[in-house]
Amino acid sequence: MSTGKETAGAHEAAIPELVIISGMSGAGRSTAAKCLEDLGWFVVDNLPPALIPTMVELGARSQGNVARIAVVVDVRGRRFFDNLRESLADLDARGVTRRIVFLESSDDALVRRFESVRRPHPLQGDGRIVDGIAAERELLRELRGDADLVIDTSSLNVHELRAKMDAQFAGDQEPELRATVMSFGFKYGLPVDADLVVDMRFLPNPHWVPELRPFTGLNEEVSSYVLNQPGAKEFLDRYAELLQLIAAGYRREGKRYVTVAVGCTGGKHRSVAMSEKLAARLAAEGVETVVVHRDMGRE
């Protein structure tokens, strides 16, 4: 029979860890939030501060499915800013482990960023960008003072900011790279989301082998036919090795997703067979891999 003390301890252990992301518009809040999302955090954008304790409570009831929550708080919710300190006090009383991350940047850097995207500052009204920046600094002054971590992004690019977030929150967790290996047919067009494209039309086409034509590259006989062609296995070995090199570089640069497109004429035989083999090689190297055969059923 469980005691009340044991039950309370179990409930306390289930309370999610919380990170509140705030800071200057244009300083990188979205990038910081995306980094935490890629590390497995449950991220909520522009949640009114008064609802943060409710979000934490819902996470505590998720039976461990939501162990880490990140909430982005910015000037779009300025009407609710007065509730933030009250919410933080509530969280502290509950024993919630929470951190405030504040993204900072110089006026010059922020002006350049707003001008580069040709967007107004959310607080500038009829004034200039610098007027909006000044108003926002004043609005966020107390929150910045309460921050557990202030990151100045004035001279940082996206990859450098991600590296700083990883250093703070990844712990021993290696940044994951998720790869999609997609077979396709050139006759149906290139995949618009492909990062890398490779062409299998240098191999003989099983379409012209009557007993293989009805099947796809998932068929063992078709796959063997493709892989036993001159140059096929050498290509597989060399390209798989190249992909491992590229994957290591993507991890260093903070890239989390890559789509490798493998094409042939119709996307039914050669590209399908080679995609399966390449995906298996990537998975064996620890890359989380998904295989998609975009055009396999179109003929």
Curated annotation (Swiss-Prot):
InterPro entries referenced in this protein's UniProt entry, alphabetically: P-loop_NTPase, RapZ-like, RapZ-like_N, RapZ_C
Record has Nucleotide-binding as a keyword: yes
Gene3D superfamilies from the UniProt entry: P-loop containing nucleotide triphosphate hydrolases
Binding site for GTP: D74, V75, R76, G77
This protein's UniProt keywords: ATP-binding, GTP-binding, Nucleotide-binding
Annotated ATP binding sites: G23, M24, S25, G26, A27, G28, R29, S30
The keyword ATP-binding belongs to this UniProt entry's keyword annotation: yes
SUPFAM superfamilies in UniProt: P-loop containing nucleoside triphosphate hydrolases (SSF52540)
GO MF annotations, alphabetized: ATP binding; GTP binding; molecular adaptor activity
Family classification: Belongs to the RapZ-like family.
Role description: Displays ATPase and GTPase activities.
Protein name: Nucleotide-binding protein SCO1952
Species the sequence originates in: Streptomyces coelicolor (strain ATCC BAA-471 / A3(2) / M145)
Lineage, top ranks: Bacteria, Bacillati, Actinomycetota, Actinomycetes, Kitasatosporales
